[in-house]
Amino acid sequence: MIVKEIRDEDFTSYKKPSMVIGFPRCSWKCGKGLCQNSPLTTAPNIDISINSLIERYMNNPITNAVICAGLEPFDSWEDLQCFIMNFRYWSGDEIVLYTGYNKEEIKDKIEWLKFYEPIIIKYGRFIPNQQPHYDEVLGINLISDNQYAEVIS
């Protein structure tokens, strides 16, 4: 699997200590110049097996969730599916998906994800000059008013 980033421990993107996996593709629906993840476009690709990612997670006693984030995890749908299916074999911990898509744009994918609970999705494109707001589900501030998270399963 190709990823752009692996953070074994993150304490800022979710209310629980999390491993963050940065997926390598994006359709630039927000506009490349607006993307808060644009530095990842020039980051080198990391070629790592799904099993190695899961092993890193399982061997870390600090993390309690996995975050699949940007660039855009839904633009690497097959890899995301494979990761989730394999992760669920080993762990029932929460999987948080950070997406710039709106809920309506990924309805079919949400239906598939419901079988792999617990899954949380943070929806919404980045919009500049918005007031940050606290999201109860994630337990953090989100940067744009249109962004929100929900537990889908």
Segments predicted by a language model, with ranges:
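Short, low-complexity, polar/charged sequence segments that are solvent-exposed and flexible
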Residues: 22-25, 40-42, 85-88, 115-117, ...
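Short hydrophobic/aromatic-rich motifs at helix boundaries and adjacent loops
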Residues: 25, 55-57
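Short, conserved beta-strand segments within well-ordered enzyme catalytic domains
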Residues: 20-22, 67-69, 96
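Histidine- and/or cysteine-centered catalytic micro-motif in compact active-site loops
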Residues: 24-26, 69-73, 100
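Conserved glycine-rich "GG(E/T)P / GGGxP" loop and the immediately following alpha-helix
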Residues: 62-87, 127, 131-139
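Auxiliary Fe-S-binding modules of radical SAM enzymes
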Residues: 2-15, 58-62, 91-153
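Canonical Radical SAM [4Fe-4S] cluster-binding loop centered on the CxxxCxxC motif
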Residues: 11-48
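Canonical radical SAM enzyme core domain
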Residues: 41-55, 74-115
